[in-house]
Swiss-Prot record:
Modified residues (Phosphoserine): S157, S168, S260
Species of origin: Saccharomyces cerevisiae (strain ATCC 204508 / S288c)
Pfam families registered for this protein in UniProt: ArfGap
PROSITE patterns the UniProt entry points to: ARFGAP
Region (Disordered) residue spans: 138-181, 196-231, 315-352
Low complexity composition-biased segments: 138-151
Protein name (Swiss-Prot/TrEMBL): ADP-ribosylation factor GTPase-activating protein GCS1
Amino acid sequence: MSDWKVDPDTRRRLLQLQKIGANKKCMDCGAPNPQWATPKFGAFICLECAGIHRGLGVHISFVRSITMDQFKPEELLRMEKGGNEPLTEWFKSHNIDLSLPQKVKYDNPVAEDYKEKLTCLCEDRVFEEREHLDFDASKLSATSQTAASATPGVAQSREGTPLENRRSATPANSSNGANFQKEKNEAYFAELGKKNQSRPDHLPPSQGGKYQGFGSTPAKPPQERSAGSSNTLSLENFQADPLGTLSRGWGLFSSAVTKSFEDVNETVIKPHVQQWQSGELSEETKRAAAQFGQKFQETSSYGFQAFSNFTKNFNGNAEDSSTAGNTTHTEYQKIDNNDKKNEQDEDKWDDF
């Protein structure tokens, strides 16, 4: 990739031209120290006016930065042969109002003739001005309002207004605009608040509910709370779904070894013994309890058998050790006590 950079000699010559006479101010708005140029007209313009020229189209005008862009030799020659003062005199001699919008001022037969004149001057040719019988420069003022409405807002604010007057009017205009925008924002947020008050409270905002602040979540509906407690063993769940409640109780017992029989007896069996004896429970409830008891007895028998085998192996290993006699005897007593306690639990279930 080639190393592109601005020719320092070209930039120096352009900066020197910019400091001569009328070139010190923008051709269109009069802003001081213009840093852009339109080579087709050989004039110096400011940054904002350069943006307007860019929107006119390259067939009318194109712009270059006198410090950041590279100029072709013929473009640099047009800047040297032209200038803001010759262009101003040409417009005035042909009754072109300098305060007209750029679209009107540079897109007409008089402006085209000046570009042709500048080209002939650079090429050492004789310029012959053409006659435009159907063109009336005085009618450009009547069409300027229509052209201004199609021009960007920056152009409208700059047309025919001295720079000093615009700067002095800026604080008041900005203050009025800020007050109007503030009132508009307050009305908008007040309308949002009214709409939020009409939203339901039991739904999240994503589903059309009310916004209640950052981090807030609506309370769970009653059916969700009841669904969360349906997995626990309680009197209400047992009455509503006896078979499902006992099945869930059996699953909890099978998955957690630390869940003792006393917990199941206290939470499920004892509260319903009286209802069982009085015949208030249905036949489905009795069948569910019988199935639960049978599964519990089978699993508990298997567990007791496995535990007995474990204790036998533990006893055989303990007899081979002569250094832990007293400790082993104490462990035997704890195991026997646990066996008796498990047998008592099994007897309770058989009685039930």
